[in-house]
Regions:
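General marker for long, soluble alpha-helical cores
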Residues: 1-226
Length: 226
């Protein structure tokens, strides 16, 4: 190991290197890439299957991850093929974005499908969409109802639990609305049942904005004196 560039090793360090099958050739391969690492980092890389060849391929793609990022990329399965696929889909993410995208299950196919639906999310957007389960089926269902939300609106809708069924119920009540009003209505708990209850008490033909205001007043709550 001393000949490979690792000198003055403790017994524990030698044992760790031996257990993980860290060879002098492996160390030299890292050194040839300009990586002069401590024993703990070398062991971490070996445990995760980081090879000099992997690092070389990643750099060939124009990425310059640091030691921790290299390990993170390998742990999360960020392969050169994955990077190429994401780039071919129209993204140019940095290392941290690639790791986040892989963690959240962002695939090139998902990105292409979003673009086919007319959406143009950036790297951070697409991660948020995956986190909030904004899948292609959900997007298509919303589009089929005549709405074209932005990326941020889709994320907000999903966070607040706006479903196609909820939209249909509001439409069936004769309401028209934009995405902001729709999300506000969901937050405030304006439902088809509430709309029917309002009509029963004489609050008919209200706009969604007025229904939201009515819900906020609480005058139709069961405890209220109507």
């Amino acid at each position: 190991m001393k000949a490979a560039g690792l000198g003055d090793l403790t017994v524990d360090e030698l044992v760790s290197l031996k257990i993980q099958n860290v060879t002098p050739e492996y160390i030299r391969g890292l050194h040839e890439l300009g990586l002069h690492l401590d024993v703990d980092t070398v062991v971490s890389m070996k445990i995760q299957g980081v090879t000099p060849e992997y690092i070389h391929e990643v750099r060939e793609l124009g990425l310059t991850p640091d030691d921790d990022q290299i390990v993170g990329m390998k742990i999360q399965g960020v392969t050169p093929d994955y990077v190429r696929g994401i780039r071919d889909a129209g993204f140019k993410p940095d290392v941290d974005q690639l790791i986040s995208m892989r963690i959240q299950g962002v695939t090139p196919e998902y990105v292409r499908a979003l673009r086919e639906q007319g959406l143009q999310p950036d790297g951070d957007d697409v991660v948020s969409m995956r986190i909030q389960h904004v899948d292609i089926e959900y997007i298509r269902a919303i589009h089929a109802l005549g709405f074209k939300p932005t990326v941020d609106e889709f994320v907000s809708m999903r966070i607040q639990g706006v479903t196609p069924e909820y939209i249909k119920a509001l439409q069936a009540a004769g309401l028209t609305f934009d995405m902001e009003e729709l999300v506000d209505a969901r937050i405030q708990g304006v439902t088809a049942e509430f709309i029917a209850k309002a009509a029963k008490h004489g609050f008919k033909n209200l706009t969604l904005e007025k229904l939201i205001q009515l819900k906020q007043t609480g005058v139709l709550d069961s405890e209220a004196d109507i």
